[in-house]
Amino acid sequence: MKITIQHIDLFPTRIWLFDLSGLSEHYPVWQSALDQLRRENPTAAGRSNRNGWNSDKIIAANPLFASLVEAANQAFIHALLQTDPNVNYSFKLELWANIHDQGGYNMFHVHQNVLL
């Protein structure tokens, strides 16, 4: 029996990688802030995190994370311009923290109505 095999690239996926190691000086401050936030709000916000904790979507509003927010905005602008440089995209970041305890993970899920 002869089997003909071919492939069609219908769903190409580009993955952008951004090196944020330049922000590493902020990591200890961010970790302390998130640990404090978890102590103050021990009940996880829910969503897909299992065996751990996640915050509400409040991280972007915290001035301690301003450099991370700026880097994320720049990254999304870069990606969106590669998608189509002739479109003036508008977006708003929602940032939250996921902290996984030993054995923790995120459930498989999708984000409806998102571009990237």
What are the language-model segments listed below?
Residues M1-P85, Y105:
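Non-heme Fe(II)/2-oxoglutarate
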Residues L10, V87-Y89, H109-V114:
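A generic structural micro-feature
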Residues D84-L95:
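A short coil-to-beta-strand element that immediately follows conserved catalytic motifs
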Residues E94-L116:
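Catalytic core of non-heme Fe(II) oxygenases with the double-stranded beta-helix
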